[in-house]
Amino acid sequence: MNPIYLDYQATTPLAPEAADAMRPWLEDKFANPHSPHRLGREAAAAVEAAREEVLAALNPPPAHVERSRDTGSLYFTSGATEALNWALKGALTRLPPERRRIVTLATEHAAVLDSVEWLGRMGAELDILPVGPDGLIDLDLAAGRITDRTGMVAAMLVNNEIGVIQPIAELAGLARARGALFLCDAVQGFGRVPLPLAACDLVAVSAHKVHGPKGVGALWVREGVELEPLLHGGGQEGGLRSGTLSPALCAGFGAAAKLMLNRREEDHRHAERLWAMALAPLGAGWELNGSALYRYRGNLNIRRRGVDPARLMADVRRVAFSAGSACASGSGRPSHVLRAIGLKDAEARSSIRLGFGRYTTEDELVTALTLIDAAAERQLDPAI
């Protein structure tokens, strides 16, 4: 029987169009895009074409900001982890000491929280804001904590664990009113929910979360925002991000972004259909983690008292999904996101995350949820 993939928040299947765009640059068109000869210039042209495709997807109509070099620039990176590290460390380094105060949320990705913690050890002042049981930030609370001494506010568009959509435009407005930079981790929301690019100063995205290849991401930087380089060496990407770019990875990212832009309405409708039918195959006892209203519809993070997710995954090997409580290190500690929304350790440890999207069929989703529910029933009642 074919496996059923329901782990779209971890990574997405590579789009055939992205694979096709990459293939020539993995075979005979192998030149270094930073070389001055003809083959190098061809590779460089492919990188620049991909850059424009990602920019177009970041800033789609109708909420269109004029896409020009003087509005903002897109820099390719090895992924969103690098982009977020660079944005935080590169921007804070350029701020005066009295503005080196960072405000972020307790539910952010480890790439943000660990970077912020490191900056704290380097002397920055940190303020990590709590969220409510629904996973959303209280804007009144945020308004009181973002002060004239705040240099950076960082928040993700869509949470990678519970799919909650934060009010990014409002948070960015609070930051701008105080003269602070605003960094948006748009990895999970890019192309799926509206991104208020005009309100942001820095935006991080990743290719493999939008049906592109792993190993490439990007950081969008508004004109006038100064960053210290994170990587030093050959001076690529305008001297701000050293390292030889892969034309293949960039081309794959560009093709995936272009496809995402062209399919955005179709993909949105498909995710809504899947979400509408997702809860029906589950029996009583399952509870949703995070807001149901302010949520990306391709994420289902649920819990059931007494269920062991590790055993569940072993019993339902046909379905690829995630345990909602395992931290990145694999230590078995409950997820910081689930703890931040007020779940007890036992509740967090009985949570699972199901992610679905473009290539998930309705039959696959129903089959997977039925198998998971039946396995949970067997766990809780061995007599079944």
Go through each PLM region and give its residues.
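Pyridoxal 5′-phosphate
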Residues: M1-I384
